[in-house]
Amino acid sequence: MCQIGVDCKTTKNECYLGSSLCLDDIGFIEQIQTTLRNDLCIDVNQMHYAGFSYGGVQGWNIASQAVDGLGFASFYILAAIPFLGNGMPPDEANFSLFHLIGNEDKLMPPNSNYLKRPGLEGHDDIVENKDGMYKPVTTDLLNKYAEKMGDCEDEESWATEFDGIKNFECFERKCQNGKAIVRCNGDFGHHPYDDLDGKNGAEVAPMILDFMLAHPRK
């Protein structure tokens, strides 16, 4: 079984696509959820997803493709943008989103600025990563999710203790039924925690947890 966010080593009879992992990832997560429900006393309204890099891409896939987002109350997606045409919002998004990414991330670029040139000619809404793969502009994708969440307000500054570290800043958009979208960015690459706390996210985690607990499933 593959770890979320870690590439699998496939055999010659297997097919690996960079936009997904090796097995039935959604089915695997569903099985974990079933086991937790059966064996532990958990609050099913406080199930949250967190994924980094390709684990974050998987989060986009779950939010987009799985029935009702597999019941997750929120998705925390770190340094991840889906491949172009993937990860689009479902007809109804009954969950919150927290997205954190670096402006200088070349594997998962939020826009074309890192290229020091415009995006694809005639297609400013398409971003090319360092490997030549195409991705959407982050803010465009989040706007599409906001449309499906319903009655979202305009973005407002969302203060954190990390503000100003390499121009780190966050913005929040409140939506109907207690849902929200928070997006954060700063001038760092594919490993934001290296710059934000230097402790593999140990000091950032409470901020993420507070967001999750404040946005239960409704």
Predicted region positions:
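Surface-exposed intrinsically disordered loops and tails
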Residues: 1-20, 115-131, 155-172, 177, ...
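Conserved alpha/beta-hydrolase "acid-adjacent" motif
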Residues: 106-118, 124-127, 133-137, 193
